[in-house]
Amino acid sequence: MKEFVTFVPGINQSRTATQLKSEMLKFYDQNSFNQDYHHKEVNLDQALPSSSKANALSLDKGDVVISNSLNLATLVSEYNINKVLSLNFTKVEFNKNDLDKRYFLYLFNVYRGVQRQKERKLQGSGPILRIPIKTLEELDIPLIPIREQERIGRIYSEVLRFQGKLSRYSDLIEKFTNSILEESIKGGK
């Protein structure tokens, strides 16, 4: 994998705030990741060019971020532009155009071959197990033609988008049902 991507670890929030003496930094946190993962579609055609970044840890729309605690990856949405990665996250920088970002997401999040490799290499104790960057670099991925990668990546993104809509729809149905049930109880008194 290391021939296609570079993994950039996040930074220690407290140390950074002390060193930079700045309260203005907004950090990419678990809520940010969840917002991106249960996502709005990120249009990669409108993603900002990497040269516009203030530093390597400042995020732009379309960047790929891995949650070290969940061992899942997602695309950064416009809602999290310019946030800085904390230690809980790793940024994936693509070195070449040989690997599609959405295809990478599919491989990292779902593909059984990569899942087995990740499970064997998990480190830590307790409920949160992490994958070291060295191990991420050594993941073996199937490389197929770029057009096929793009097709698989688009399908995977559409499935995630559809799942997000279904989840929101399910929440609305539950709220609506609960509201009707409460009103029927109040009306019954």
Where is each model-derived feature located?
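Short, surface-exposed loop/turn microsegments at beta-strand edges and helix-strand junctions
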Residues: 18-25, 45, 57-59, 76-89
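Alpha-helical membrane-embedding segments
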Residues: 80-85, 118-124, 159, 165-166
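Charge-rich amphipathic alpha-helical interaction elements
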Residues: 3-8, 51-53, 65, 75, ...
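A short glycine-rich beta-alpha junction/loop motif
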Residues: 83-90, 123-150
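Sequence-specific dsDNA recognition surfaces
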Residues: 2-16, 31-61
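Non-catalytic DNA-recognition/assembly elements of restriction-modification systems
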Residues: 1-24, 143-189
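A short beta-sheet element
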Residues: 67-109
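Glycine- and charge-enriched low-complexity intrinsically disordered segments
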Residues: 101-125
